[in-house]
Regions:
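Flexible, P/S/T/G-rich "lid" or insertion loops adjacent to the active sites of thioester-utilizing
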Residues: 10-19, 172-227
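Short, intrinsically disordered, charge-balanced linker/junction segments flanking boundaries
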Residues: 245-249
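Short, charged/polar, Gly/Pro-enriched secondary-structure boundary elements
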Residues: 66-74
Length: 249
């Protein structure tokens, strides 16, 4: 897809801020897991989803592997569990995968006294954020509820073929024509005060949480004027960018 091509380009060191993979690392606390059983469920999930047993070749083609090894989950346990968790976290939180080597993910478990800490690391070449939550839901339903993993109705190739067919539809062509005519009139990117030289490519996630009462009032107010939550937040972002940008548009 177009976004996968962009991710592959961003992994290369051909330009400033390049050489960075699009990647997510997350931790999930679950009731105490039996590692062998959890491993079996994850392997069933890997087998079901083509993306989880795919790689990317040197000519930027996604290849679904027909044969691949049984995935072994790394398990941390013992008296020094805190140190092992820290080591796993440091190893995975900034991991960069070779796109042509399977797997493009890591799954580990740290066994605590009463819970298990699930460590998940995925390259966004194979999954997006919504897909990760689907995988987690599948794992929990299969492991805790005993549900059977159902086969997919479509494979990756069929889905991509359907997407490409949409590009020949009248609606797609009409929308494309509209935006191509708008391009000359779109404003430039905001000129923001930034560092001239980036010493190290890295990321830090900054979060702001709005308390439930305040957010309920916001939702009530914006719904009265027909504004969606997404539009509201994007507008705030635009106002902040405008505040710091040296070009008014």
């Amino acid at each position: 897809t177009e976004i996968q091509s962009a991710y592959l380009l961003g992994r290369r060191n051909h330009f400033e801020l390049g050489g960075v993979a699009s990647h997510v690392y997350m931790e999930v606390i679950l009731p105490l897991l039996d590692i062998d059983r959890a491993e079996k469920v994850w392997n069933d999930i890997i087998l079901k989803h083509d993306a989880l047993h795919s790689i990317f070749t040197s000519n930027n083609t996604q290849k679904v592997l027909k044969e691949f090894a049984y995935y072994k989950i790394e398990c941390n346990e013992g008296a020094d569990i805190k140190e092992k968790i820290a080591l796993t976290r440091d190893k995975l939180k900034g991991k960069s995968y070779n796109a042509d080597i399977w797997p493009l993910f890591d799954i580990s478990v740290s066994q605590l006294d009463d819970n298990s800490l699930l460590h998940l690391s995925f390259d966004f070449l194979i999954l997006d954020w919504a897909s990760i939550w689907i995988l987690l839901k599948e794992f929990e339903e299969c492991y805790f509820d005993g549900k059977t993993i159902m086969d997919n109705s479509y494979d990756l190739k069929e889905i991509r073929t359907s997407q490409l067919k949409l590009k020949h539809s009248s609606k797609y062509l009409s929308d494309k024509d509209f935006w191509e005519r708008r391009i000359p009139f779109l404003p430039d990117a905001p000129l923001l005060p930034i560092k001239n030289k980036i010493v190290k490519n890295g990321f830090e996630r900054i979060q702001l949480r709005i308390d439930e009462n305040t957010w309920s009032k916001i939702k009530s107010n914006i719904s009265e004027i027909g504004v969606t939550q997404t539009s509201f937040l994007v507008t705030i972002l635009a106002l902040v960018l405008n505040r710091w940008s040296s070009n008014s548009e």
